[in-house]
Amino acid sequence: MPPPRPPCHPTGFRHFDEFLEGGLPCGRAVEFLAPPGSGKTTLVLRLAAACQRHGLRVALLAADGSLTPAYAKAQGLDPAAVLWIDPALGERALSVAQRLLAEQVAGLLVLDAPDALGLPRHAFRPLSRALASSQALCLITRPRASFTPAPLLRNPLRLLLYPEAIEASNGRRALRPIK
């Protein structure tokens, strides 16, 4: 008998939910790895908008400072309801994110390009522990060039995004999990 599936939040995208066997897993990070300019931030913001419509409070840390409320709104998010974490805080930004998860203020944390913070991997450990002990979600965008970077948080679901396959008729070849 297979182990029971952890709770998940449907994304609202049928093929994506089928691929994830029900939706985004609670208490776990999902890393989207793809080349720069491939649409991973747009995809993650649209997934966040779907979660927001289902009642989750969204916190967003755009480490490179490139995300604007206008862009978030264009992807379906209500920017006035988003908890924006200032990347200029550096390591303190991770502490803010960790507290939002630990105190159940946010049900979804989006980390856009967290490598741009320039922090060592061990700085992400408290955030990883807070996520594991909650039912929150964490969506992470990271670049993928000729290598796959080491995970930032413990036990993430890592997905490679293949932009050249997005035009596929069923859309299923656009994502591949990393084992």
Regions found by a protein language model. Name each.
Residues 1-79, 91-102:
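The Walker A/P-loop phosphate-binding site
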Residues 61-63, 85, 141:
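Structural motif
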Residues 129, 136-179:
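Phosphate-binding/switch region of NTP-binding enzymes
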Residues 87-139:
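Phosphate-binding/switch loop-helix module in NTP-utilizing enzymes
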Residues 75-77, 126, 155:
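Short, solvent-exposed amphipathic alpha-helical segments in soluble enzyme
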Residues 70-71, 95, 121, 149-152:
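Short, well-ordered secondary-structure micro-motifs
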Residues 64-67, 88-91, 115-117, 144-148, ...:
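Conserved nucleotide-binding/hydrolysis micro-motifs of P-loop NTPases
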